[in-house]
Structures are given as structure tokens and as C-alpha cells.
A protein has these predicted regions:
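N-terminal targeting sequences that direct proteins away from the cytosol to non-cytosolic compartments
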Residues: 5-9, 15-60, 138, 147-173
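N-terminal secretory signal peptides that target proteins for export/translocation
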Residues: 1-2
């Protein structure tokens, strides 16, 4: 009986040492990020160490950059009169046409209650990995995405998902 207790104490000590050495970071978008209001009723957070990039004002894309990483936001007018599921398939088709591999689609639950789609994959030509959070309404498609090289993407994915999922759009205009 004493040997079992000693074994348990040793086991708890080893687990404690390993757990203390783990590096676990918690990200809070509203504490660690910057609020960006993209228009009437549309807002999201981006990391405070990313900088708003002055890109082409005519392409309608807002970019936030840090080294080899980019967060972007864009709104596209819906050209088709389809329901959300059909628009999701059309967006998936657009990504596939731009030669992406390992494309996965899922529907995460956002705290804001928005029904959106998450597209995750990589571009064949550039090797960049991406995750796009896409929200469809009757008139527009809203895309908030993260793209980076494989190393940075893998390292920062959990953190970036917190920011992507901070996207909110109110229906009150």
C-alpha cells in the first residue's frame, strides 16, 4: 500500500513538472487586439502587433500585416440570387478555381450568433495556408481571412481563429 502511495506521489510530481513547463497562451481579442469598425454594423478585432496596410484603395480589401502574415477583410456584392448554402458552394468553387489544395469547410459557432462558414486550405502556387471566415447575407459576402506561410500559420492558427471569430455584423442599419 505504501509503495502505491509513493508511486502516485512521484507520478503527480512528474506530471506537475511537465505541466509547469508547458507554454499555454490565452488570447482575448478585446484585450489583446484592436477593434476595427468596417462599416455600419460591421466590426472585428485584429492583433495589436499587426499594422493597417495601405494597399490598392480600388480593390476593396482592407489588409493588416505583420512580417509574413496577413489578415484581410473584404465585402463582395452577391452576383447571384441564391440561398446561403448555395452561396457557400459558389465560394468554395471560386477557391477551387484558384488552385487550392486540402480545402475543408465547416460552420463554427460564433459568439455573435452569426451563421458563417470557415474555409481552410492552402494555395498550390504560393504554398500559403489560409483560413477564411465567410458570412453571407442577401446582398453581400463578407470575408475575414488569415494567410501565412506554413510555419507561421501553424504557430499562430489558434490565436488567429480568436480574432477571426470576433467578426460581428448587426442587422440594424
Amino acid at each position: 500500500m505504501k509503495s502505491i502511495i509513493k508511486l502516485m506521489v512521484v507520478f503527480v510530481c512528474v506530471v506537475s513538472l511537465v505541466a509547469c513547463g508547458r507554454k499555454d497562451t490565452t488570447v482575448s481579442a478585446n484585450k489583446d487586439g484592436v477593434l476595427y469598425e468596417a462599416g455600419v454594423g460591421v466590426s472585428f478585432y485584429y492583433p495589436s502587433d499587426f499594422k493597417l496596410s495601405e494597399g490598392n484603395p480600388n480593390d476593396g480589401v482592407t489588409r493588416f500585416t505583420k512580417e509574413n502574415q496577413i489578415l484581410f477583410y473584404k465585402v463582395e456584392e452577391n452576383e447571384y440570387d441564391n440561398d446561403t448554402d448555395q452561396l457557400s458552394e459558389l465560394y468554395k468553387g471560386e477557391l477551387e478555381a484558384s488552385e487550392v489544395s486540402s480545402l475543408k469547410v465547416k460552420m463554427p459557432a460564433l459568439e455573435s450568433g452569426l451563421k458563417c462558414y470557415e474555409y481552410k486550405g492552402s494555395y498550390v502556387k504560393t504554398g500559403l495556408k489560409f483560413i477564411h471566415l465567410v458570412y453571407f447575407d442577401d446582398k453581400n459576402t463578407y470575408v475575414y481571412g488569415y494567410e501565412a506561410n506554413r510555419k507561421d500559420f501553424r504557430k499562430n492558427l489558434k490565436k488567429m481563429i480568436v480574432y477571426l471569430e470576433s467578426f460581428t455584423k448587426s442587422s440594424v442599419l
